[in-house]
């Protein structure tokens, strides 16, 4: 889908904030569009969020990416364009920057003021969460991807941004390699309880965290989910992902973001474990069969994939590719009753479209449910996340 780009700028005090807007195409200025405001991480800039901006625009959003004042790395080919020095930057100044961007966006005649979403990665995710809490009546949704909720702990340990210093004798300048922070950054966050501050936000939250993140341990994300009301925050833990996704992981992450934006609930998470494969040729057609086992642990069902699960990938000359997985799980439903789920999953026009048949009375609604799925690739086999509009309806 084609998109349009336009430079963005606004003021915070005497500093100019610069970035880029991403528009769906075609775009009608008289129409109202939902808005996604994107927050980059430590030593990043708005260009590091460009892939998110384009994806949101393809979904019909106006996306706004910007450089935090004093953010970014000291030396980089594509420098930060907003004003400010890194030694003056703090978490609070970034929240103020984001607040200024929100105010600017609310003045756009084409912005749907009922649908303003904040999304951020790493330090930008932390900042987005704080800003959502402080402007909770104006923010319709929050997406935090590996948010750096570890920052206060890192300050208390004297290792902010990868630096090493004595937290009892904090230097005026904290050398983080690619950037230099001021002592004020440390002093501000060292006494902060990020989870208490995040909890003030009452809207829908999606929190995505890699299990192999060497900077932000996934325990911070687990604790963050617990700080919100029950059912308010969906936590997605991604296998084999560190402190940034590879291309395939980004695609599956954004597929999950798309389900979140559509208001769909993850009802089943199935860990697939590939056991063996075989290749077949038939009248010029090539077919690969992947056999697998696996297991599911979710609030609705817990069980294992029975022997015989198979993913068939076939390519016929003139007909293109077709992918179809079929398998059966056996286990216990949400009422503790033994049951089976038979799943057929194949690609539709825009999403994976699984069909489930079950003998569970408690899960009988699955037999008629409108379902979609996201495949999240990982070592040994994917995780299949199945979504429904609202469970039980």
Predicted regions and their residues:
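Alpha/beta-hydrolase active-site loop
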Residues: 85-108
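Catalytic histidine-centered segment of alpha/beta-hydrolase-like enzymes
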Residues: 241-254
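Short beta-strand/loop motif that positions the catalytic acidic residue
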Residues: 201, 207-209, 213
């Amino acid at each position: 889908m084609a998109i349009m780009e336009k430079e963005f700028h606004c003021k915070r005090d005497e500093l100019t904030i610069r970035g880029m807007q991403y528009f769906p195409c075609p775009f009608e200025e008289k129409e109202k569009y939902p808005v996604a405001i994107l927050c980059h991480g430590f030593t990043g800039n708005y260009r590091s969020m460009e892939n998110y901006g384009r994806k949101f625009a393809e979904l019909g959003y106006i996306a706004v990416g910007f450089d935090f004042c004093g953010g970014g790395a000291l030396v980089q080919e594509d420098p930060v364009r907003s004003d400010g020095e890194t030694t003056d930057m703090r978490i609070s100044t970034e929240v103020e920057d984001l607040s200024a961007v929100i105010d600017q966006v609310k003045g756009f005649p084409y912005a749907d003021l009922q649908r303003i979403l904040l999304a951020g990665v790493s330090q930008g995710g932390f900042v987005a969460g704080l800003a959502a809490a402080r402007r909770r009546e104006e923010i319709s949704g929050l997406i935090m991807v590996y948010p750096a909720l570890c920052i206060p702990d890192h300050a208390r340990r004297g290792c902010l941004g990868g630096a090493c210093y004595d937290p009892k004798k904090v230097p005026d300048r904290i050398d983080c390699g690619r950037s230099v922070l001021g002592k004020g950054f440390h002093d501000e966050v060292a006494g902060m309880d990020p989870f208490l501050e995040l909890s003030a936000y009452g809207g829908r939250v999606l929190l995505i965290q890699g299990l192999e993140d060497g900077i932000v341990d996934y325990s911070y994300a687990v604790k963050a989910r617990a700080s919100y009301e029950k059912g308010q925050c969906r936590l997605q833990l991604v296998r084999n992902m560190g402190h940034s996704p590879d291309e395939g992981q980004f695609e599956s992450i954004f597929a999950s973001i798309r389900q979140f934006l559509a208001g769909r609930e993850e009802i089943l998470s199935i860990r697939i474990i590939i056991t063996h494969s075989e290749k077949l040729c038939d009248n010029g057609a090539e077919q690969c069969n992947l056999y697998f086992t696996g297991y599911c642990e979710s609030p609705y069902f817990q069980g294992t994939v029975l022997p015989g699960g198979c993913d068939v990938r076939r390519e016929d000359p003139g007909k293109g590719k077709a992918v179809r997985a079929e398998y059966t799980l056996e286990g216990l439903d949400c009422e503790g009753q033994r049951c089976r789920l038979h799943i057929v999953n194949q690609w539709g026009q825009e999403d994976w479209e699984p069909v489930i048949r079950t003998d569970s009375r408690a899960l009988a609604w699955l037999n008629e449910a409108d379902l979609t799925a996201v495949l999240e690739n990982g070592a040994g086999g994917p995780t299949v996340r199945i979504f429904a509009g609202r469970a039980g309806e």
